[in-house]
Amino acid sequence: MNNNLLIIAGPTAVGKSDLSVDLAKKLNGEIISVDSMQIYKYMDIGSAKISKEEMGGIPHYLIDFVDPSKEFSVAEFKELATEKIKDIQSRGKLPILVGGTGLYINSIICNMNFAESDKDEEYREELEKIANEHGNEYLHEMLKDIDLESYNSIHFNNRKRVIRALETYKLTGKPFSSFKAKNSIYETPYNIYYYVLNMDRAKLYERINKRVDIMFEKGLLEEVKNLKAMGLTDDMQSMKGIGYKEVLYYLDGKISLEQCIEMIKQGSRNYAKRQLTWFRKDPRAIFIDKDTFSSEEDISSKIINDIINS
């Protein structure tokens, strides 16, 4: 199992956690969360964070470790997750990615480069000033000596892209053109088993609505009040998550509680739809319709057989 990587993905509320813990127990695995909200501390209810009890003694990584006042990039996630995969494999265990953030998953299993995530605002402003004073062609000429390929492929009037190319060179010391995927986007060093859980849409939406009701019963309002008291505001990355921004609107008197709950349910259903659209783009993803299996045990057996017999 040295280079195997199991992925259990799917839309919100489909039931990924229970299945993944069961698989981890049976396959000697450890779990790496691929959820862009569960990374944050103090945000347990609205992110539906897995509890210690639900973990069933299986180690879970990249959960509950980022301060919600801080920004956290996909590039940072990729670096931490890649290190953790190596660590798990070095101990003879199976790393299992579990979650619904498609970009996090792709950062690990696709040939992507996140140099473009880095920014140098000061240098950008300087380049904008140069372009305003001397024109786009002058700015474009600055590319010629450092990145001829980008100079030839980017039109001088595409100021935003020209600035991006110059900025990338300043940040990395490498030409912007060198960051293009040289091979297939689906090239990966791992032997992947990629499963996406799904179910009848009406059933999934019912589960989503019920989950939102349970969040309020568990104390979502109190959780967001505490975050607000800590100084968190709606312009922070963490507070833009579904469930948090709407409760902030309610606490600020912008909407009623009824509207708040309905907005979270609608937002979560729309998000589930977008998640499924994202997962369908990857030809390696094997969709598992939960309705066609009589039990979770059967789904677990199917995945284990696939891995053993491959």
Swiss-Prot record:
What Gene3D superfamilies does the database record attribute to this sequence? 1.10.20.140, P-loop containing nucleotide triphosphate hydrolases
- GO BP: tRNA modification
Q: Where are the transmembrane segments?
A: none
Where are the residues of the annotated region Interaction with substrate tRNA? Answer: 35-38
Family note: Belongs to the IPP transferase family.
Give the matching HAMAP family.
IPP_trans
Name of this chain's protein: tRNA dimethylallyltransferase
Q: Which organism is the protein's source?
A: Clostridium perfringens (strain SM101 / Type A)
Q: Which gene encodes it?
A: miaA
